[in-house]
Amino acid sequence: MTWKTRRVYKHGVFCLEGDWWPDLKNPASVEPVLRLLSESHISRVPYIYRDVGTAEDFKYYLEKWTQTRYAEYPILYLGFHGVPGKIVVGDKRRKDSHVTLDNLEDWLSGSCAKRVIHFGSCETMNVSATRLQAFLKATGALALLGYRKIPEWIESAAFETLLLGELQYNAMSRSGLKTARERVKERLGGCQLLRELGFRMEIRE
């Protein structure tokens, strides 16, 4: 099937991003990836982007994402530093900056039908499949995406452009996501880059 004949769904991206470096003069951001996708003549992916500096702000925007008015933005992109099972929001020295899967599961309980969550963070997905499936069951989300390793910035940005773009050509369903996962592997010519990044897509059973 060629690009011209594939249906485009235009699944919007709701992106929350924290600071990557202590020096605020460093402009590093994932927004250029989203801007590129939004300006693509094929997909024109809509997106909402917010800078987040505190756990309080993070929870505020997380609740916004679950509202019906944002149903057209079913892809939640969380761009933060991470460790296994957690993301770090704001000053890592603060106890409340470590947002765990347990926290997210509690805040998003039953609110993620027909939605997916992408952790654009190091190692957050380096937990058991059993734990991820429990999260998916509790929240109703279709899938969790992210990394088990510490990916390089350029490689992950290039990969996420491909990943988010591919999601536009598949229904927001378990079967659609399985198709997207296989097509990403095919377009990368195998699984080597996926292994180097430690990428995984856990789809609800």
Predicted feature residues:
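Short glycine-rich anion-binding loops that position phosphate/pyrophosphate groups of nucleotides
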Residues: G79-P84, T124
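Catalytic cores of nucleophile-dependent amide-cleaving enzymes
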Residues: K92-A157
